[in-house]
From Swiss-Prot:
Its main location: cytoplasm. This is Acetylglutamate kinase. Pathway: Amino-acid biosynthesis; L-arginine biosynthesis; N(2)-acetyl-L-ornithine from L-glutamate: step 2/4. It catalyses: N-acetyl-L-glutamate + ATP = N-acetyl-L-glutamyl 5-phosphate + ADP. The record marks 8, 209 as: Transition state stabilizer. GO terms for cellular component: cytoplasm. GO terms for molecular function: acetylglutamate kinase activity; ATP binding. Belongs to the acetylglutamate kinase family. ArgB subfamily. CDD domains: AAK_NAGK-like. It is found in: Cytoplasm. Keywords: Amino-acid biosynthesis, Arginine biosynthesis, ATP-binding, Cytoplasm, Kinase, Nucleotide-binding, Transferase.
Length: 248
């Protein structure tokens, strides 16, 4: 059996057919954490709300939280349907279900938080019954739901499961020269990442992607990788032929 993986997928459903094909065909166990950025932004805009971000995190006032949750749940249900139609039985959940994601608020951002505890029992029960869980990044504190960055939520869940984390993005990995495929870094350590940041090799939009992978390692994942979400990517990552793998 192929290795069990935690896979973080984006929230855009445009062009998702190939990605759904890839996930449905993977022979090993999967837990998926999904975002919902495009859907959230679209719904907020329709209702007259402005999207604001601080440090890459969506500011979520209490009056916007229900909209955020609705958009995430719609995204999860559509992804679950797509996988199920392809023969991989999937269920869309959030951290509210069985209280599986407990969070701590970042009050300067409204109802935004970070995951402090993961209850993996529900996920393990579903996996044992042959289901693939899809988890929306909503956590709970004493006051109610919190909007959590999907990348950091994915890292926390991977660590709690003790599974590798694969972050599927729009980039193929870390390259010394993005125009030269021969310069891909197949493996990196946190120390090497810091050196590449200092050299300006890892910069701009690549920084949060790499930080998400490193946060998964800190949470307890045995390894993490970033790779482009395309057909055949998961097996290629396992073979070391695609993406960049991060290890301690």
């Amino acid at each position: 059996m192929s290795e069990a993986l935690l896979v973080k997928v984006g929230g855009s459903l445009r062009g998702a057919e190939a990605l759904l094909d890839e996930l449905a065909a993977y022979p090993g166990p999967l837990v998926l954490v999904h975002g919902g950025g495009p859907e959230i932004g679209a719904w907020l805009g329709r209702l007259g709300y402005e999207s604001r971000f601080v440090g890459g995190l969506r500011v979520t006032p209490p009056e916007q939280l229900e909209v955020v949750e609705m958009a995430l749940y719609l995204t999860g249900k559509r992804l679950a349907e797509g996988l199920s139609r392809r023969g991989r039985k999937a269920l869309a959940l959030s951290g509210r279900d069985a209280l599986c994601l407990k969070g701590r608020a970042l009050p300067e951002l409204g109802r935004v938080g970070e995951v402090v505890e993961v209850e993996v029992g529900l996920l393990q029960d579903l996996l044992a019954k042959g289901y693939t869980p899809l988890l929306a990044p909503i956590a709970l504190d004493a006051e109610g739901p919190l909007n959590v960055n999907a990348d950091t939520a994915a890292g926390a869940v991977a660590g709690a499961l003790g599974w590798p984390a694969v972050f599927l993005t729009d980039v193929e990995g870390v390259y010394r020269d993005p125009k030269d495929p021969r310069t891909r870094f197949p493996r990196l350590t946190p120390k090497e990442v810091e050196a590449l940041k200092g050299e300006g090799v890892i910069q701009g939009g690549m920084i949060p992607k790499v930080e998400a992978a490193l946060s998964a390692l800190r949470a307890g994942a045995p390894w993490a990788a970033i790779a482009k979400g395309e057909r055949g990517v998961l097996e290629a990552v396992l073979r070391g032929e695609a993406g960049t793998r991060f290890t301690l």
